[in-house]
Regions:
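Sec-dependent bacterial lipoprotein signal peptides
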Residues: 1-12
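Ser/Thr-rich, low-complexity intrinsically disordered terminal regions
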Residues: 12-153
């Protein structure tokens, strides 16, 4: 059963459930990685798609790889809707499996890819996940990352 949460503020009624679903970034499970594959190998696969790592973040239960924004000119899909350009950033979250600790190899990670894509409409960047060119690129990236992780476990 799905319920919506409504909030009344002055003259406007906001449906938070619909907004949250609409703006939800895309996440994909890409496989299981060793510490070395998470820190080095994933970066090599990302470079093959022209995504450059901007930041690594290690926490007690997970590690993150965050790429720089990749800027692209409007594709045929976006030109028909008058979008000028888009920017895409990837976040790879490696959830640490605490049962997997090995003295020399560190931990194993369950890895998830999150895509953040925004298109410029002339005045603002707005979330957009309907670009065919982007979706094709992300599908290929997911296949390559999953393949790399399955081979190099």
């Amino acid at each position: 059963m799905v319920t919506s949460l409504f909030y009344f503020n002055g003259c406007s009624l906001l449906n938070f459930f619909d907004k949250q679903t609409k703006d939800m970034p895309r996440k994909h499970y890409i496989g299981r990685a060793s510490t070395e594959n998470f820190q080095k190998g994933i970066g090599e696969v990302l470079l093959g798609f022209d995504y450059h790592i901007e930041q690594y973040d290690n926490g007690p239960t997970s590690s993150y790889i965050i790429t720089r924004w990749k800027i692209r000119e409007g594709s045929e899909d976006s030109l028909s809707t008058e979008f000028k350009e888009s920017k895409t950033r990837l976040i790879i979250n490696g959830m640490i499996d605490n049962q997997s600790f090995e003295m020399n190899n560190g931990f194993s990670y369950d890895c998830f890819l999150e895509i953040q894509n925004f298109t410029y409409n002339g005045s603002d960047f707005i979330p957009n996940y309907e670009d065919t060119e982007l979706n094709d690129e992300i599908s290929n990236l997911i296949k390559n990352l999953s393949s790399f992780l399955s081979i190099n476990q």
